[in-house]
Amino acid sequence: MKRKDTLKDYRGKSIDQLQEVKIELLQQLFSLRMQKGTGQLKKNHLFKSAKRDIARINTIISEKNK
């Protein structure tokens, strides 16, 4: 149910708010890459989750632009 809740939350936001969330996720993804490079990252599944959330936000932004 978590995914449906986040989708409803994303769809309820404006495009500017979605852009801010996207920037936060991109920063998180960068941080994860740095942690992986230094060997500090133990939860590799967070990459996939962050990338999918970014893709979801991009999809919703493109839907709202139409």
UniProtKB/Swiss-Prot annotation:
Q: Which GO terms describe its molecular function?
A: structural constituent of ribosome
The reply to whether Oxidoreductase figures as a keyword in the UniProt entry is: no
Gene3D superfamilies from the entry?
Answer: 6.10.140.1970
User: Can the keyword Lipoprotein be found in this entry's annotation?
Assistant: no
Which GO CC annotations does the UniProt entry carry?
cytosolic large ribosomal subunit
Pfam families, alphabetized: Ribosomal_L29
User: Biological process (GO) annotations?
Assistant: translation
Q: Which SUPFAM superfamilies match?
A: Ribosomal protein L29 (L29p) (SSF46561)
Keyword line? Ribonucleoprotein, Ribosomal protein
| Annotated InterPro entries | Ribosomal_protein_uL29, Ribosomal_uL29, Ribosomal_uL29_CS, Ribosomal_uL29_sf
Of which family is this protein a member?
A: Belongs to the universal ribosomal protein uL29 family.
Q: What is this protein called?
A: Large ribosomal subunit protein uL29
